[in-house]
C-alpha cells in the first residue's frame, strides 16, 4: 500500500532501505511548490486573509499556523534517520536518484512523469500516487501549479476576443490531448 503522508513514508522507510534495497526511501528536492502543497494538504493557509481571498494578502500565515514547523519537522526527521538525504534545490532535484533506482519514492508534478518514464526506460515499474500530506490524518488537497493560465480583463475588445479565441483553442480536445501526452499535465 502506498503511503499517503510523510508519516506513512517514515513508517515503511526502514523496510524500503534495509529490505527493499533502496538507498533512500524518499528523494525530494528543496522546492517552493512542494512546500506550498504540504501546507495545502494540512488544510492550512499560506498567507493571511484566507490566502488573499477575503482581502489582499499582506503576510505569510505558515509561520504562525504551524504549517511550516510541521513540514520542516517531518522532513528533518526523515533526513536525520537517513531516509531522505538532501538532494539539492529544485523540483527535479529528486528525480535523478529515483530514476537511477537509488530512491524508492520521489515527489513531483505530473509534468515530470514523461521525463521519469524516459529516464527509467523500463528498468523498473513506475507507479503514481497523490501528493502526500504530513500526517495520515491530513485531509487537504493541493493547489494549482505553474501550468495555470490567466487572462487579464482589460478595456480592449479586440484583445479580449483574441484572448477568448486562444482559450477556446487551448481547451479543444485536440489541444488538450496533445498537451497531456507531451507534458504530463492534465
Regions found by a protein language model. Give the residues of each.
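Paired acidic/hydrophobic, glycine-rich loop segments that form the ligand-binding mouth/hinge
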Residues: 104-109, 127
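Glycine-centered hinge/linker elements that transmit conformational signals in sensory
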Residues: 12-14, 56-88, 131
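Extracytoplasmic/periplasmic substrate-recognition and gating elements
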Residues: 81, 118-185
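Beta->alpha turn/N-cap motifs
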Residues: 91, 108-113, 131, 146-148
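Short helix-initiation/N-cap motifs at beta->coil->alpha
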Residues: 4-10, 86-100
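Short helix-loop capping/hinge motifs at secondary-structure junctions, enriched
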Residues: 1-2, 19, 45-47, 68, ...
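Short, solvent-exposed loop/beta-turn-alpha elements that line the ligand-binding surface or hinge
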Residues: 45-70, 118-120, 133-141
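Extracytoplasmic/periplasmic solute-binding protein
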Residues: 7-60, 103
Amino acid at each position: 500500500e502506498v503511503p499517503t503522508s510523510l508519516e506513512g513514508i517514515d513508517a515503511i522507510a526502514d523496510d524500503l532501505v534495509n529490505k527493499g534495497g533502496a538507498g533512500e526511501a524518499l528523494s525530494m528536492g528543496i522546492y517552493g511548490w512542494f512546500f506550498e502543497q504540504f501546507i495545502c494538504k494540512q488544510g492550512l493557509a499560506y498567507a493571511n486573509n484566507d490566502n488573499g481571498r477575503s482581502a489582499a494578502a499582506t503576510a505569510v500565515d505558515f509561520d504562525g499556523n504551524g504549517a511550516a514547523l510541521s513540514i520542516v519537522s517531518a522532513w528533518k526527521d526523515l533526513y536525520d534517520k537517513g531516509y531522505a538525504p538532501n538532494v539539492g534545490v529544485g523540483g527535479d532535484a529528486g528525480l535523478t536518484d529515483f530514476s537511477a533506482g537509488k530512491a524508492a519514492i520521489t515527489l513531483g508534478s505530473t509534468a515530470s512523469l514523461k521525463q521519469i518514464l524516459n529516464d527509467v526506460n523500463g528498468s523498473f515499474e513506475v507507479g503514481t500516487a497523490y501528493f502526500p500530506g504530513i500526517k495520515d490524518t491530513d485531509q487537504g488537497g493541493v493547489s494549482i501549479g505553474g501550468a495555470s493560465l490567466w487572462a487579464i480583463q482589460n478595456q480592449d475588445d479586440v484583445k479580449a476576443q483574441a484572448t477568448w479565441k486562444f482559450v477556446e483553442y487551448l481547451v479543444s480536445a485536440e489541444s488538450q490531448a496533445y498537451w497531456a501526452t507531451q507534458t504530463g499535465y492534465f
